[in-house]
């Protein structure tokens, strides 16, 4: 197993080779040249990256295709978020998407007393018991990945007799100038849907229906 630094450098080089996409034709020899290491070490890194879910690998007649997974991209976006925090760079983002209905899970989770107390203490709101779900446009997925890399406002998880409720992170946001918060699990879940909480029933407040297109400004 290679070091985390070698993982990061390898994923970064693969992304550089891929440019705008997340896939690149890249031999282990070429990656070795890019990293300044032996071909054997580069081959081992590629195998480790694939085994640990950071990339997928396909061999074709044209050569080897390395595709960076969401887990691999998270390595880069987390590094970006850490550098932004260290350098005090603000990275507010705008995400566009479509209003969609969930399975009612948002209401169940938001209604937990242990969460509500923290929402009031840390976010300054007692939320409407439900979430507004937005299916993120393909073009906004890089912005969603960027948000996932940031720490946000920590909401502590807890246990009950029946189950465990995980920690959550929240980000201040606005939708049509109405303050709200984007919430997501601290344990990364790869989904193209974001959940929004507010002290208002946003569907009624903004007259939103499934299929409506919206933009959400998120403050990291």
UniProtKB/Swiss-Prot annotation:
It is an enzyme of class 2 (transferase). CDP binds at residues 102-107, 200-203. Its cofactor is Mg(2+). GO terms for molecular function: DNA binding; metal ion binding; nucleotide binding; riboflavin kinase activity. FMN binds at residues 188, 195. It catalyses: riboflavin + CTP = CDP + FMN + H(+). One of its GO terms (biological process) is riboflavin biosynthetic process. Keywords: Flavoprotein, FMN, Kinase, Magnesium, Metal-binding, Nucleotide-binding, Transferase. Its EC number is 2.7.1.161. Binds 1 Mg(2+) ion per subunit. It comes from the Archaea. Residues 93-220 are annotated as: Riboflavin kinase. InterPro entries: HTH_CRP, RibK_CTP-dep, Riboflavin_kinase_CTP-dep, Riboflavin_kinase_dom_sf, WH-like_DNA-bd_sf, WH_DNA-bd_sf. Pfam families: CTP-dep_RFKase, HTH_Crp_2. Catalyzes the CTP-dependent phosphorylation of riboflavin (vitamin B2) to form flavin mononucleotide (FMN). Belongs to the archaeal riboflavin kinase family. PANTHER family: RIBOFLAVIN KINASE. This is Riboflavin kinase. It comes from Thermoplasma acidophilum (strain ATCC 25905 / DSM 1728 / JCM 9062 / NBRC 15155 / AMRC-C165). The gene is ribK.
């Amino acid at each position: 197993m290679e070091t985390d630094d070698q993982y990061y450098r390898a994923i970064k080089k693969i992304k550089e080779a891929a440019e705008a996409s997340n896939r690149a034709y890249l031999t282990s020899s070429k990656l070795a040249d890019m990293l300044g290491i032996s071909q054997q070490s580069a081959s081992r890194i590629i195998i480790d990256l694939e085994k640990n879910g950071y990339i997928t690998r396909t061999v074709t007649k044209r050569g080897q295709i390395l595709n960076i997974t969401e887990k691999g991209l998270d390595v880069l976006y987390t590094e970006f978020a850490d550098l932004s925090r260290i350098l005090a760079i603000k990275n507010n983002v705008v995400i566009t998407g479509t209003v969609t209905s969930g399975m009612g899970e948002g209401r169940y989770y938001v209604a937990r007393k242990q969460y509500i107390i923290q929402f009031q203490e840390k976010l300054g709101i007692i939320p409407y018991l439900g979430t507004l779900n937005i299916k993120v446009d393909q073009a906004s997925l890089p912005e969603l990945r960027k948000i996932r890399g940031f720490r946000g406002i920590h909401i502590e998880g807890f246990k009950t007799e029946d189950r465990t409720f995980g920690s959550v992170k929240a980000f201040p946001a606005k939708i049509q100038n109405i303050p709200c918060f984007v919430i997501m699990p601290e344990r990364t879940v790869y989904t193209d849907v974001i959940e929004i909480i507010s002290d208002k029933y946003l569907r009624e407040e903004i007259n939103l229906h499934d299929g409506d297109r919206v933009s959400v400004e998120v403050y990291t």
